[in-house]
């Protein structure tokens, strides 16, 4: 079996903090080229953002076509002096491989590559269809020059995908406890309340926006947006900052702002959600409070891969290796699956995510072996 642990180590040793690649894609490209994949390195640009390198590799020309997706970029390591082992060492200690990206998600990518190479080795270097890899270096930051553009680039070339496995760390506690089959949408905005600046000693000459924005925050937060759906938990609106831009104690501010984020389910579209919140705001304002919402652009719409043959196949592979039947979940934050879902059904399954983004991020060596076996089981069933 191809050593997924070695690939994980080699990837961790590339300090690929977004937007730097630091050689990570080269590690993967060399392995895939040697196995017969046709590879493409594609760089995308956008004014005001860093250029990002991406990798697309495919073997086979027919269907069915399964693609493994992922990202080699990582978040900064934080205070490196606080790490038990160097953050980009990829050292193994007490059954764990340490390093930024071990869990999120260089370990998952390494396992998918190792599984694909083993499958090809056992089947005459050709799948009964096609296997590809969609790997970006722009997931942990703005996600502008990464998967979303790589998918469009592939589509413009005539590439089509039947199914996708995204190797994000989906498991909560142990390997095999969770597959992500969808994600809630994400919409952010700023609530702005207009008052009138003045001296605190003469409140009748001013209009204080602070009490008003407080009332509106309560009004928008208290009433549920929905009761959830068959596959999703209830949507939630959370205010995250309140600011008046005023450092003086004797001045009534003229304007107040409160930022918020909504994680919403399939009871809403982006448009209907905005309309609902605007309607509630207008009701709470009445004829007295002057307020409006500045909505931020969002590319994080809700999606769901409905349970069916593909999810059944993945569940069977997981259950065979781990003895556990995974939960089909839609919890958690956003991922690049939101982009992939526009092109094909996508599931997320990877390592246990308990230490991702933390000091001493680490993956169990045993879990890496387990995930490789599961991915191999998915390929065996997919091309059966």
From Swiss-Prot:
Keyword annotations of the record: Amino-acid biosynthesis, Cobalt, Diaminopimelate biosynthesis, Hydrolase, Lysine biosynthesis, Metal-binding, Zinc
Return the SUPFAM superfamilies for the record. Bacterial exopeptidase dimerisation domain, Zn-dependent exopeptidases
Q: Where does the chain bind Zn(2+) 1?
A: 71, 104, 168
Q: Which GO BP terms, alphabetically?
A: diaminopimelate biosynthetic process; L-arginine biosynthetic process; lysine biosynthetic process via diaminopimelate
Q: Which EC numbers characterise this protein's activity in its record?
A: 3.5.1.18
What's its catalytic activity? Answer: N-succinyl-(2S,6S)-2,6-diaminopimelate + H2O = (2S,6S)-2,6-diaminopimelate + succinate
Cofactor comment in the record? Binds 2 Zn(2+) or Co(2+) ions per subunit.
**Listed InterPro entries:** Bact_exopeptidase_dim_dom (IPR036264), DapE_proteobac (IPR005941), Peptidase_M20 (IPR002933), Peptidase_M20_dimer (IPR011650), Peptidase_M20A (IPR050072)
Task performed by this protein: Catalyzes the hydrolysis of N-succinyl-L,L-diaminopimelic acid (SDAP), forming succinate and LL-2,6-diaminopimelate (DAP), an intermediate involved in the bacterial biosynthesis of lysine and meso-diaminopimelic acid, an essential component of bacterial cell walls.
Q: What protein name does the entry list?
A: Succinyl-diaminopimelate desuccinylase
Which organism was this protein described from? Bradyrhizobium sp. (strain ORS 278)
């Amino acid at each position: 079996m191809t050593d997924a642990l070695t690939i994980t180590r080699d990837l961790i040793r590339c300090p690929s903090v977004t937007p730097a690649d630091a050689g990570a894609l080269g590690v993967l490209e060399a392995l895939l080229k040697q196995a017969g994949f046709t590879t493409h390195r594609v760089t995308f640009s956008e004014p005001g953002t860093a250029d990002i390198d991406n990798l697309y590799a495919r073997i086979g020309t027919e269907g069915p076509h399964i693609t493994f997706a992922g990202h080699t970029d990582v978040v900064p390591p934080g205070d490196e002096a606080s790490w038990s082992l160097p953050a980009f060492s990829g050292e193994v200690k007490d059954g764990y491989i340490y390093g930024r990206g071990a869990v999120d998600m260089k370990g998952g990518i390494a396992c998918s590559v190792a599984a694909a190479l083993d499958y090809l080795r056992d089947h005459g270097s050709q799948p009964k269809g096609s296997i590809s890899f969609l790997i970006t270096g722009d997931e942990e930051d703005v996600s502008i020059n990464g998967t979303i553009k790589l998918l469009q680039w592939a589509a413009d070339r005539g590439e089509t995908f039947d199914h996708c496995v995204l190797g994000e760390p989906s498991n909560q506690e142990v390997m095999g406890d969770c597959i992500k089959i969808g994600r809630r949408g994400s919409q952010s905005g700023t609530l702005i309340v207009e008052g009138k600046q003045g001296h605190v000693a003469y409140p009748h000459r001013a209009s204080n926006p602070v009490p008003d924005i407080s009332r509106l925050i309560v009004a928008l937060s208290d009433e549920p947006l929905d009761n959830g759906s068959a596959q999703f938990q209830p949507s939630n609106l959370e205010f995250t900052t309140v600011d008046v831009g005023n450092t003086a104690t004797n001045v009534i501010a003229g304007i107040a702002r409160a930022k918020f984020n909504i994680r919403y389910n399939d009871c809403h579209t982006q448009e209907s959600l905005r309309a609902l919140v605007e309607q509630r705001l207008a009701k709470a304002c009445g004829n007295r409070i002057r307020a409006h919402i500045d909505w931020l652009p969002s590319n994080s719409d809700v999606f769901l891969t409905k349970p069916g043959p593909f999810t059944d196949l993945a569940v069977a592979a997981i259950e065979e290796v781990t003895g556990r039947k995974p939960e089909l979940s839609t919890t958690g934050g956003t991922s690049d699956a939101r982009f992939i879902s526009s092109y094909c059904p996508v599931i997320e399954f990877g390592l246990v995510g308990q230490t991702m983004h933390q000091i001493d991020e680490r993956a169990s060596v045993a879990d890496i072996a387990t995930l490789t076996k599961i991915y191999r089981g998915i390929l065996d069933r997919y091309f059966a």
